[in-house]
From Swiss-Prot:
This is Protein Rep68. One of its GO terms (cellular component) is host cell nucleus. The lineage of its organism: Viruses, Monodnaviria, Shotokuvirae, Cossaviricota, Quintoviricetes. It is found in: Host nucleus. It comes from Adeno-associated virus 2 (isolate Srivastava/1982). A divalent metal cation binds at E83, H90, H92. It catalyses: ATP + H2O = ADP + phosphate + H(+). It is an enzyme of class 3 (hydrolase). Its EC number is 3.6.4.12. Residues 196-216, 488-536 are annotated as: Disordered. InterPro entries: Helicase_SF3_DNA-vir (IPR014015), NS1-Nuc (IPR014835), P-loop_NTPase (IPR027417), Parvovirus_NS1_helicase (IPR001257), PV_NS1-NUC (IPR049901). The keyword Nuclease applies. Pfam families: Parvo_NS1, Rep_N.
Length: 536
């Protein structure tokens, strides 16, 4: 949700008193302008003060022009409302915080203020007290620049009616029709209040009704709880992921010092909640049904290697949900560039927490695998030193493992995905290779053999493709056989040729030259040779 700075600009209504010495041309410009309401407005034009509105319209237009220049954000969101107060006409100018940090806001606003004096008031500063001011977190000295969220608009600005409400401008799509339409304003306010009520009810439902634990109830705590809940839903555990998911949201929390301090705490709390209450399927399975899965890269890789994508998808889904008992591991086997790492990497990066097996360090190979949602074993080998722990982890059993510079820690049942082009069921012990653990290891795995090389422009599997594939698997589940080799299927057999397609067999050309004489001639020649031999 974007954050906004609020600048309150007072608008002169008594030109002689508020702008002493202003030129006649300025007075004529203000007096000559006539305003009309758009056709979809239900406001009363007679309740609108047109002369101050002319000045206000020029002020907001020039202010936004300068704001876009200093913020370097031409698409920055804004909402401006012109109101008639008890003492003065004034504008509430809400501008998105994007591009302007709080520490330099005062400097930029001073520049904009001088521009408005020169361009609009011909160098004459209004005598209105504090006519150009940014809203602070508290009155008096020491308050920081206040950042409000979008809820400020339906909470405070939209409920205003005539004659207090004079005019409004915005580039926010959801409020365009409500600027000058009182009925639409009421509808949006009611919709917002309903949403707030539902959110509060949902927060109450999420709390343990049998718990008597004290809960701080305030706007600050509600906003913090909303932030942590959003981070958990999106699986965000770092500031980098937050920026990639919603840059405006991240910047809005950096705009003020009080909200900036919540960032690391919220990420830390969200991570703890995810590790304790969420599992891999919560992030691997997408929310929306998939209509066409044929363009999905995981689907293409499996189909290219002769697997039935629906059956293979059911294997992946059951693996993620730990449905197959001790057969807790998927082994993607094959040479380079066949997509095995492409699939495993995408699955691992889709969940908030994944661990990698460091098989090169035999002392602490599973150091990174504690409290993870998925374990990824990339291009490794099975050694006699780690095979017993590996069998427990691959089989989804609880096992304690040594950790570097720490005491041993327990690895809970966690889905494992292995990518390798070597035999992971052969145990290497020094210079020898043994197969005594082959059957137990095979009983813990589903093996996919990927042998078809991918084109150079095939591309990387994305997180969304992973979620779509698992969602499609959930909607098309089939029965899976508990076998080491995942059966292939879906390949089309070439039909037998018909009689019309069968041609006469070609004559085979002999490669050895045949003698030119017949058998009879050969016998006569042998007789002549025998007779000549006797005569000698």
């Amino acid at each position: 949700m974007p954050g906004f700075y609020e600048i309150v600009i007072k608008v002169p209504s008594d030109l002689d008193g508020h702008l002493p010495g202003i030129s006649d041309s300025f007075v004529n410009w203000v007096a000559e302008k006539e305003w009309e309401l758009p056709p979809d407005s239900d406001m009363d034009l007679n309740l609108i003060e047109q002369a101050p509105l002319t000045v206000a319209e020029k002020l907001q237009r020039d202010f936004l022009t300068e704001w876009r220049r200093v913020s370097k954000a031409p698409e920055a969101l804004f909402f401006v409302q012109f109101e008639k107060g008890e003492s003065y006409f004034h504008m509430h100018v809400l501008v998105e915080t994007t591009g302007v940090k709080s520490m330099v806001l005062g400097r930029f606003l001073s520049q904009i203020r001088e521009k408005l004096i020169q361009r609009i008031y011909r160098g004459i500063e209004p005598t209105l007290p504090n006519w150009f001011a940014v809203t602070k977190t508290r009155n008096g000295a020491g308050g920081g620049n206040k950042v409000v969220d979008e809820c400020y608009i339906p909470n405070y600005l939209l409920p205003k009616t005539q004659p207090e409400l004079q005019w409004a401008w915005t580039n926010m799509e959801q409020y365009l029709s409500a600027c000058l339409n009182l009925t639409e304003r009421k509808r949006l306010v009611a919709q917002h209040l309903t949403h707030v009520s539902q959110t509060q009810e949902q927060n109450k439902e999420n709390q343990n009704p049998n718990s008597d634990a004290p809960v701080i109830r305030s706007k600050t705590s509600a906003r913090y709880m909303e932030l942590v809940g959003w981070l958990v839903d999106k699986g965000i555990t770092s500031e980098k992921q937050w920026i990639q998911e919603d840059q405006a949201s991240y910047i809005s929390f950096n705009a003020a010092s009080n909200s900036r301090s919540q960032i690391k705490a919220a990420l830390d709390n969200a991570g703890k909640i995810m590790s304790l209450t969420k599992t891999a399927p919560d992030y691997l399975v997408g929310q929306q049904p998939v209509e066409d899965i044929s363009s999905n890269r995981i689907y293409k890789i499996l189909e290219l290697n002769g697997y039935d994508p629906q059956y293979a998808a059911s294997v992946f889904l059951g693996w993620a949900t730990k449905k197959f008992g001790k057969r807790n591991t998927i082994w993607l086997f094959g040479p380079a560039t066949t997509g095995k790492t492409n699939i495993a990497e995408a699955i691992a990066h889709t969940v908030p927490f994944y661990g990698c097996v460091n098989w090169t360090n035999e002392n602490f190979p599973f150091n990174d695998c504690v409290d993870k949602m998925v374990i990824w074993w990339e291009e490794g080998k099975m050694t006699a030193k780690v095979v017993e722990s590996a069998k427990a982890i691959l089989g989804g059993s609880k096992v304690r493992v040594d950790q570097k510079c720490k005491s041993s820690a327990q690895i809970d049942p966690t889905p494992v995905i292995v990518t390798s082009n070597t035999n992971m069921c052969a145990v290497i012990d020094g210079n020898s290779t043994t197969f005594e653990h082959q059957q137990p290891l095979q009983d813990r795995m589903f093996k996919f053999e990927l042998t078809r090389r991918l084109d150079h422009d095939f591309g990387k599997v994305t997180k969304q493709e992973v979620k779509d594939f698992f969602r499609w698997a959930k909607d098309h589940v089939v029965e899976v056989e508990h076998e080491f080799y995942v059966k292939k299927g879906g390949a089309k057999k070439r039909p037998a040729p018909s009689d019309a397609d069968i041609s006469e067999p070609k004559r085979v050309r002999e490669s050895v030259a045949q003698p030119s004489t017949s058998d009879a001639e050969a016998s006569i020649n042998y007789a002549d040779r025998l007779a000549r031999g006797h005569s000698l």
